[in-house]
């Protein structure tokens, strides 16, 4: 996460409504619990050279077959991609992503193993669930070097194909505090959706304006794709992110779990809505 300033956040709640808010059919989801989320931080890969293979192994544990996982390389940047084809080929695509790289210091547990864990568990929840839209799960490389992975992916979308992309959900640095939306890195309608979903799920939620900050959502916003960044930082982030202190000990598993539940429900609501609803 490229950050300079962030607004205060509220205290993270220790519980959340355990039922997906979208009702019918939700029981077919494979929902993770906070203990399962927390277990993913028992062994965080601390070297960048280990991260991509660790991401692949995580998705395989979540049920992905080796044949479903693609490593897409453009200009020396590697992104891990899984495409889940929707039942309605003309209903559009949703990207859900998180960068897997880290800075040299620390283990990058908050920034951004938390995001990778979130999208992997969202994948498991939806793996056998029938969706309308095609969902593209992406672990982006080289975000810390300038959003390189997401920029290369967004640059690869042909101009006449951009309307096929309904939304991009970016998860970056959950686990320090309450779930938040980065207003200045997000589309207004997706900001409103995140707020609505949080209220329905009774998840503590807040807004932040990240002055001078940047995230992978920007790469897609620049191409006209509705995008949102969800995070969970507090005002203590400068003491943790990009330092030796960014370790699993700084991750609140409940906070990551709440972010996971929010993102999963957001994705499902986008899936059940026309693309135009979020543009």
Model-derived regions: residue spans:
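Bacterial N-terminal signal peptides
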Residues: 1-8
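Structural recognition of the beta-strand scaffold that forms the well-ordered cores
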Residues: 81, 93-97, 136-139, 166-171, ...
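Acidic/histidine-rich catalytic neighborhood of metal-dependent amide-processing enzymes
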Residues: 102-197, 203, 209, 213, ...
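Sec-exported extracytoplasmic/periplasmic mature domains
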Residues: 42, 60-65, 121-131, 155-162, ...
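N-terminal hydrophobic or amphipathic helices/low-complexity stretches enriched
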Residues: 11-47, 84-86, 91
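A non-catalytic alpha/beta surface segment that caps or lines the substrate-entry region
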Residues: 32-85
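Extracytoplasmic/secreted envelope proteins and their assembly/folding machinery
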Residues: 34, 38, 52, 56, ...
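Active-site-adjacent substrate-binding region
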Residues: 177-279
